[in-house]
Amino acid sequence: MLAELENLFALQDKNYREFHARLMPNIEKERIIGIRVPVLRKYAKELAHGSRLFLSVQKEKRVCNTVKENDCDNVEKFLNTLPHYYYEENNLHMFLIMQMKDYDTALAYLEAFLPYIDNWATCDSGVPAVFKKHKNELLLNVYKWLDSDKPTPSGMALAL
């Protein structure tokens, strides 16, 4: 994961870090790298396009041009290594889930990640597009999350 952190720090904007730290007082400043959301979304998309985990059933072509091949291969390891330390790691995690094309895979990764979401911005960062095709199936999970006594699953249910 060291290479992943190096890549994230390469995207850092220190002025944005200062600004963003004031928006999230519940996150310690040293846990914020300072990466603008569009930049982090683009990076997530690049990683997703190169990872086998994000290929649809039609077996799309695996492309990993803009980031190192090794980084694309480490995506699954990153998603399975929880909790993350940095706020942007959590956002990257959510952005990667949003790129998944298989409903069951996206749902499994989201459910595994929910207990580790510790801020509103990660929770509200988006919904996997594949969920729109499975609204009835997803509704059962939404009800379960709404019934949770923890704020993050409830917040995610409301975001969906």
Describe the residue ranges of each PLM region.
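Alpha-helical scaffold domains
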Residues: 1-160
